[in-house]
Design a protein with these regions (language model features):
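Flexible N-lobe loop architecture of eukaryotic-like protein kinase catalytic domains
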Residues: 21, 59, 68-72, 83
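Conserved N-lobe ATP-binding subsite of Hanks-type protein kinase domains
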Residues: 27
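Conserved N-lobe loop of protein kinases adjacent to the ATP-binding glycine-rich P-loop
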Residues: 32-39
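AlphaC helix of the eukaryotic protein kinase fold
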Residues: 46-67
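Short beta-strand micro-motifs within the conserved protein kinase catalytic domain, predominantly
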Residues: 75-87
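Conserved short submotifs of the Hanks-type protein kinase catalytic core
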Residues: 84-98, 102
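Protein kinase catalytic-loop region centered on the HRD/HxD motif
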Residues: 122-132
Length: 138
């Protein structure tokens, strides 16, 4: 059953600020965490989770937690299921935005592209060492 993307769920301990983006299986929102007080990004599944999907969603958060000590991988703070059955994962908020938005307003220099490529390769290498394969790199 598809959940409405226009109405993000209420999550206890967090106050919605705005929508940050959307992927094929989840939306990402900026929330204010009440304690400790900080802004966080929350990835929320678009659909209610059947038991198999819930296991995958939880596994993804656990894998992210294992590799989040890497400087280019966001920290995971919490993982759960909303009252209406949608999975969510609370991440560190990186306020810089994404590269797609950046590229819509300008170009990267050769040095910047090289730096991004090296940083991305380093993060992927860290994940691969733990047996994690990212299946949605854009």
């Amino acid at each position: 059953m598809e959940a409405s993307r226009s109405i993000p769920p209420q999550i206890p301990g967090y106050t919605l600020i705005k929508r940050l983006g959307s992927g094929s299986e989840a939306d990402v929102y900026l929330y204010q965490q009440l304690s400790p007080a900080r802004q966080v990004a929350i990835k929320i599944s678009k659909n209610t989770l059947d038991p198999r999907a819930a296991v995958r969603f939880r596994s993804e958060a656990n894998f992210m937690g294992q590799i989040s000590t890497h400087p280019y991988i966001l920290s995971v703070y919490e993982n759960g299921v909303t009252v209406n059955g949608r999975g969510y994962t609370v991440f560190e908020y990186a306020p810089g935005g994404n590269y797609k938005t950046f590229l819509e307003h300008g170009r990267l220099t050769a040095d910047q592209m090289l730096t991004v490529g090296i940083d991305l390769a380093s993060a992927l290498f860290t994940a691969h060492r733990k047996g994690i394969i990212h299946r949605d790199i854009k």
